[in-house]
Amino acid sequence: MLQSYTGDRDVLAGLTGYKLTRGILCAMRRPRLPSVQQICFQARRVAVLDNITDAANIGGIFRSAAALGVDAVLVMRSCCDPLCRKAVRVSMGTVFQIPWTYIENNVKELGEWGFKTAAMALCEHAVSIDDQALMAEGRL
């Protein structure tokens, strides 16, 4: 049986720090996150996020990762929580679709598992993510 409680809008706003437009809120248990090894086992394309502190940026990156066919996202502890309200909203739910987990600052394991490092940039010399040289890489 699902328990439900009611509260005055002002009380709910005080609990959450937000004025809830429809007066509904819920609390859920977070799923246990998989290990980095589990996430990367069959992945070919992995995004590693470091020091992304704005929730909207985290959500946008997850949404872009889904559009670009990224297999998994590894989030360093210096980043905003991908499950915070704004990140989830901006991600349009893709944070629940793309496998992700936290990774410590040491990313050497990725190289040991055959991943090559690439960075994304908006500049004249940048190549498309669909570039044949990048596509030929087994793990990126």
Can you annotate each of these PLM segments?
Residues 1-140:
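Post-transcriptional modification and biogenesis factors for structured RNAs
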